[in-house]
């Protein structure tokens, strides 16, 4: 099992290219199930979750061609991948694969819309709270589907003639449930109106792609999305938007380690709340023609309180990274998590590096310290793992992060990108 070794104390200076967003790429890939034509996606990151979803889609009948060939391109960024699903050959999504990644559960929407029935295992993925599927079930039921849970699977069936458009308001904002209901509604009869919809940029990206495929979706990016059903979708070519979580992660790494870095192929507008929070913490951030520049030279890190919220609020996927930054602040800060329960598993690992953090319910109190000290630590989930890397960049001595397969799920060549900017980061294979 691989480990990441970090020698702290080095500023970051240089250019870091930002990859395509994993959280956008996954639903876009799943949308290929909605058409028998070819969906071509550009700027697809090379990540473990993307590779796993390719396998899952292949089981359903999707032919996958990477950069025009059917082999993996290990040495290239921004891959172009062609997805063609002439016929759906299997409407069952097995526990063996779905349990490894929660987002693969989202195939339930396109399979139900195109084939009228499917059997999908209940999901797995990051160990962050319960993440119930109730919202998915309720949304699809509103479109006329019958849903039955049996032996760890959901058996879903559309009414004769297909799904039927309806008005439905989610009781709680859910990005995944919004993705699924939006995809399913594209082929439903009549008009669907989704209330309390997720407003994340990844939802807008999916809607733009579906519209390019012939869907009729309006309102994406607002709390109300309207979908006029069509009889079929065609192929399209679409570029995956930049990864705002990767952007924020590297911005926080620079704020932690110090230095001057340009983040290329991204957009400040994708994470305005996080950028403003970093400015309050003492980082100097400015937009560039193709991204953003972040500097922190000499000045200390100021304590800032945050509360995670759905977009446009502070992203839960940057909470662990920001907490790592606050461990070196000049005072006391508070981090309150409102999206997921049990998303403080990184706290005890940060404490091994010398962080002073106390928990009270869903709020963490962080007392900034003058120095962190390197130590062996263990990744517990995707975002927590990178928070340990950020802390290691500023810790005295050597930090080793184990279980880095979590990192490989969501960060493309992290150690390479950091090393190019002067960090001492090394992957150790065992």
UniProtKB/Swiss-Prot annotation:
CDD domains according to UniProt: UdpNAET
E.C. numbers: 2.5.1.7
GO MF terms held by the record: UDP-N-acetylglucosamine 1-carboxyvinyltransferase activity
Pathway it works in: Cell wall biogenesis; peptidoglycan biosynthesis
Main localization category: cytoplasm
InterPro entries given in the database record: Enolpyruvate_Tfrase_dom (IPR001986), Enolpyruvate_Tfrase_sf (IPR036968), MurA_subfamily (IPR050068), RNA3'P_cycl/enolpyr_Trfase_a/b (IPR013792), UDP_GlcNAc_COvinyl_MurA (IPR005750)
Catalytic EC class: transferase
Enzyme active site: 126
Entry GO CC: cytoplasm
Localization of this protein: Cytoplasm
Binding positions for phosphoenolpyruvate per the UniProt entry: 22-23
Job description of the protein: Cell wall formation. Adds enolpyruvyl to UDP-N-acetylglucosamine.
NCBIfam families documented for this protein: murA (TIGR01072), PRK09369.1 (NF006873)
Protein name, UniProt field: UDP-N-acetylglucosamine 1-carboxyvinyltransferase
Native organism: Rhizobium etli (strain CIAT 652)
Name of the gene encoding the protein in the UniProt record: murA
């Amino acid at each position: 099992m691989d480990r990441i070794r970090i020698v702290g104390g080095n500023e970051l200076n240089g250019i870091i290219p930002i990859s395509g967003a994993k959280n956008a790429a996954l639903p876009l890939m799943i949308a290929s199930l909605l058409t028998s034509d070819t969906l071509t996606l550009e700027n697809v990151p090379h990540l473990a979750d993307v590779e796993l979803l390719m396998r899952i889609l292949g089981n359903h009948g999707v032919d996958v061609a990477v950069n025009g060939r059917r082999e993996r391109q290990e040495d290239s960024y921004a891959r172009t991948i062609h997805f063609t699903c002439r016929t759906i050959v299997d409407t069952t999504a097995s526990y063996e694969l779905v349990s490894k990644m929660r987002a693969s559960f989202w195939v339930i929407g396109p399979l139900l819309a195109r084939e009228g029935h499917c059997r999908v295992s209940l999901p797995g993925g990051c160990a962050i709270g319960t993440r119930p599927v109730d919202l998915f079930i309720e949304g699809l039921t509103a479109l006329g589907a019958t849903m039955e849970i049996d032996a760890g699977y959901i058996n879903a069936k559309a009414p004769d003639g297909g799904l039927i458009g309806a008005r439905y308001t989610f009781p709680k904002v859910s990005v995944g449930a919004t993705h699924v209901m939006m995809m399913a509604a594209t082929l439903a009869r009549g008009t669907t109106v989704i209330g309390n919809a997720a407003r994340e940029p990844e939802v807008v990206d999916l809607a733009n792609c579906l519209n390019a495929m012939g869907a009729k979706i309006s309102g994406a990016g607002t709390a109300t999305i309207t979908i006029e059903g069509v009889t079929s979708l065609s192929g399209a070519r679409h570029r995956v938007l930049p990864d705002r979580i990767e952007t924020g992660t590297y911005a926080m790494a620079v704020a932690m380690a110090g230095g001057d870095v340009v983040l290329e192929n991204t957009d400040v507008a994708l994470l305005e709340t996080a950028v403003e929070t970093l400015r309050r913490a003492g980082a100097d951030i400015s937009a560039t023609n193709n991204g953003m520049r972040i500097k922190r030279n000499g000045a200390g890190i100021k304590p800032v309180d945050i509360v995670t919220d759905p977009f446009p609020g502070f992203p839960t996927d940057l909470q662990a990274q920001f907490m790592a930054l606050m461990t070196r602040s000049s005072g006391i800060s508070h981090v309150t998590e409102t999206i997921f329960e049990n998303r403080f598993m990184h706290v005890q690992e940060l404490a091994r590096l010398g962080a002073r953090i106390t928990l009270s319910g869903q709020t963490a109190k962080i007392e900034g310290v003058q120095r962190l000290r390197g130590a062996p630590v263990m990744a517990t989930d995707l975002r927590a793992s990178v928070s340990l890397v950020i802390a290691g960049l500023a810790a005295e001595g050597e930090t080793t992060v184990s279980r880095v397969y979590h990192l490989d799920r969501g960060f493309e060549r992290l150690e390479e990108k950091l090393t190019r900017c002067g960090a001492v980061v090394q992957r150790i294979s065992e």
